Amino acid sequence: MNKNIFVACDVSSQKEILELLTQIHTRISGIKIGLQYITKHSPEEIKQLSKFNKPIFYDGKFFDIKNTLIESVKSLKDLNVSYATVHLLNGFESLKAASEEARKINLRLLGVSVLTSFDNYELEQLGFKYPVEEQVLRLIKIAEKANLYGVICSPLEIKMIKKVAP
């Protein structure tokens, strides 16, 4: 069985999540919590997930001004998370500073470029002048320069990304 799997805890009930993890924790590599979970559960409930001795991936997609981004990253230390996501649109300086703070607390920051639900039309409506593929590449280069641990991408983008950030 492939153990390179993080289970997404995108259900509302903490009881349900703990029961599921009790059943499958030996067959997974980690636990992913997204906005649905994060906004419903307390820091204490997030910490409860640590009892399974698996890395916790905090998929909060932080996107804010530099100081707030840095403080948000620092606050994750108390939650015992191993990975967290930041939007690459935060820009190089903010990402570099956040990456430096993350390394101090042994947190791996992963960059989110263009949401997979976006198409060229949507990007254009938001004022972006480049198509999705080119925008993704531009943001990936920023992530690499800012020394992020990695990026989140569509499986369709992997080949393209490896050309600019091996």
Predicted regions and their residues:
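Conserved alpha/beta-domain cores
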Residues: 9-25, 32-50, 66-68, 162
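Boundary/entry segment of secreted carbohydrate-active catalytic domains
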Residues: 1-11
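Hydrophobic beta-strand scaffold residues
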Residues: 56-57, 109
